[in-house]
Each structure stands twice: as structure tokens, then as C-alpha cells.
Amino acid sequence: MLPAVGSVDEEEDPAEEDCPELVPIETTQSEEEEKSGLGAKIPVTIITGYLGAGKTTLLNYILTEQHSKRVAVILNESGEGSALEKSLAVSQGGELYEEWLELRNGCLCCSVKDNGLRAIENLMQKKGKFDDILLETTGLADPGAVASMFWVDAELGSDIYLDGIITIVDSKYGLKHLTEEKPDGLINEATRQVALADIILINKTDLVPEEDVKKLRTTIRSINGLGQILETQRSRVDLSNVLDLHAFDSLSGISLQKKLQHVPGTQPHLDQSIVTITFEVPGNAKEEHLNMFIQNLLWEKNVRNKDNHCMEVIRLKGLVSIKDKSQQVIVQGVHELYDLEETPVSWKDDTERTNRLVLIGRNLDKDILKQLFIATVTETEKQWTTHFKEDQVCT
């Protein structure tokens, strides 16, 4: 585990990391459990946040409270030498291996320090004993890279699917973490975690003045104009707010159209920092032209703003109207991965078809992106090339 950064005050309260009461896991399943697990895909929710924000506290809360949910939790960073880790991880011959334990509230728990995917593969052997998987990342991890693994897995017919990304932000130190400038000019870890989140939990709100929480909330909203922001104390949250989000599948299209209508454009909280931009273009899009637009942004990275800075897209989401398709199509993107999927929602005959996109990233220019979308989707490839040049590829 990487050492904690900052003062002792930024670390988790040791009392909050007391080991939950454990019972040995049974190796056999009842007939009902086996039936309930057959054919059903299991949602994976990624829990991320800066060091000391409250990730372990949230997971301990889920593992100990009576909530009638059967949740499997994978602890990827549980604090060096903590009582929780000692109970969940067994060292033998100098190698750490996983030990799944069943808690009295029906949850499963495991500590793993290398590969969360391997832990999930082992966990799936117990399919039928749980309904959801929560995966904790390390404090400095890029949740986009973790999310991409499960998104790709789902495309390969896996038994799991990515449900959403939850980012926890410390009320006391969050603003400091989000405004920290890295010497190499890269996006700092805390900001990237917020930018990728579907749900942002502002934690420990009881430890700071209300005015500080408002400032932090404003900064978070300036980074991510799409995610839902919730305020919590000691990471206590209604599980319905963090589970069954369907943030990465077609079911989210049912509610996405209404949400996209209220997404505000944001201004950067630091020069060249992350912002949310949104635009709408009426009409139908040709699927191959839409792919060209997205691939130039995410893959080729050859789209620049007015200051000649490369536009870097971290998260992309939207609803589009594809020519000759009656269903609304949801477009999702994380880093260099993206997907188009038909939703259960049909376009009504008496309503105008439209395309509405939300992009979260750095150096984004709404006007240029909207013009490029119109040119790419509705005009010829020759006209598109007037907006970028091959020798301007960003590095």
C-alpha cells in the first residue's frame, strides 16, 4: 500500500476500521441460492476517492449494517496493519492470498492487494450468495482504467457488468486535493476521480463549516456537471443511492434524456482544468460519421481548441438519433473506450429527433466541438478535414 499523504488528520479514524464480526463462509449453496444466481449478471460498483476520504468507512458500514442487501466487497486498500486486513488476509510463505468471509448481515468480504479481477473471478464461484459487488480502489488509482477492464469484460459475455463509479471526497481536505497542481502538467488524481464519477459523496460534512462544504460542492460541480452530489457523515448513505445505477448500460437511457436537459456547462476551477460541456444538435446522425467524430476525439486525439491545446475527453455521455433506427441510442465513453447501444426508449413520431452530448475533460471548447459534430455527422468527410490536420495530432 502506498503511504498516506498529508497530515495524520487526513487518515481514517482507526475506530471506524474495527473489524466486522465474521463467521466462516459455507462452501455449499442452498437450492434457492443456486437458482437465483443462474443466468443473472452481477453489477460491479467501483468505490474510489483520495487517501483518507472515507472509502473503508463506507465499506465497513455496508458490511456491518442490517440492510437486507447481499453485497460482496473487495477491499483493495484497507490500511497497513488494520484489524480488518488482519482478519481478511492470510500470509503464508510470504505470499498474500484471498480469504472470502461471510458476515452476519449476509455480505461477503475479501482483502486483495494485487488484482481485483482475480478476486472477482474467485468470487464468481460463489455466485448465488450475493447480488452486488463493490470494488475499492487505491487512493491514487485512476478509476477510469479500472472501469475499462469491466466494461470490456461485459462485451465479452462476462457474468458481471459495470454499474457505476462512486467517488468519495473529504470535506476538510477535498478542495486542497482538487486544486493541487501537478508539476508535470497532468490532471491530479482527485480531480480525475471526481470527473469520472456517477455519484460524488462529500463526506465528513460535520467536521467543517457549511460555507466550506458549499465551496467544495461548487468546485466539484465545476468539474463534473453530470454526476449526482450527495453529502454524508461517516460515509453513511442509503444503499439505493450507490447500487443499481445502470450508469453504463442502455437502461440509463430511460432517465438520461431528462437529466441531460438540465446539465449545466461549467467553467474551469483552474486554468486548463477539467470542465463539463454540453451541446445539442437536431436531426439524425449517421452511425459511421458519429464513430468518426468520437474516434477523432478519443483515439486520434487530434482535436484542438482555439488556443491550440489538445482537447482531452475523460468521460462522454449522451443520447443520439441514429438514422433508420427507431430507438434512442445512448453513447458512453471513458478514456479511449466508447460504446453505442440502443435504449428501450423509442423516438415519438410527433417529436423532433435530436442529439445531445455531455463531455467532461480538459481544454474543451463547446463551440468547436458542436461545429465538428455538425460537420462530421451531417456533411462530407472532406468538409470535416477543414477542422483538423493530421500533423496536429496531440501527444
Swiss-Prot record:
What reaction is this protein's catalytic activity? GTP + H2O = GDP + phosphate + H(+)
Enzyme Commission numbers on file: 3.6.5.-
> Where in the sequence is the signal peptide annotated?
none
Q: Which Pfam families does this UniProt record tie to the protein? A: cobW, CobW_C
GO molecular function ontology, one term from the record? metal ion binding
Give residue numbers for sequence motif CXCC motif. 107-110
Recite the UniProt keywords alphabetically.
Chaperone, GTP-binding, Hydrolase, Metal-binding, Nucleotide-binding, Nucleus, Zinc
List every stretch annotated Disordered. 1-22
- Top-level taxon of the source organism: Eukaryota
Family statement drawn from the similarity comment of this UniProt entry? Belongs to the SIMIBI class G3E GTPase family. ZNG1 subfamily.
Q: What does this protein do?
A: Zinc chaperone that directly transfers zinc cofactor to target metalloproteins, thereby activating them. Catalyzes zinc insertion into the active site of methionine aminopeptidase METAP1, which function to cleave the initiator methionine from polypeptides during or after protein translation. Mechanistically, the N-terminal psi-PxLVp motif binds to the C6H2-type zinc finger of inactive form of METAP1.
- Know the name of this protein? Zinc-regulated GTPase metalloprotein activator 1C
Q: Which organism is it from?
A: Homo sapiens (Human)
Q: What is the lineage of its organism?
A: Eukaryota, Metazoa, Chordata, Craniata, Vertebrata
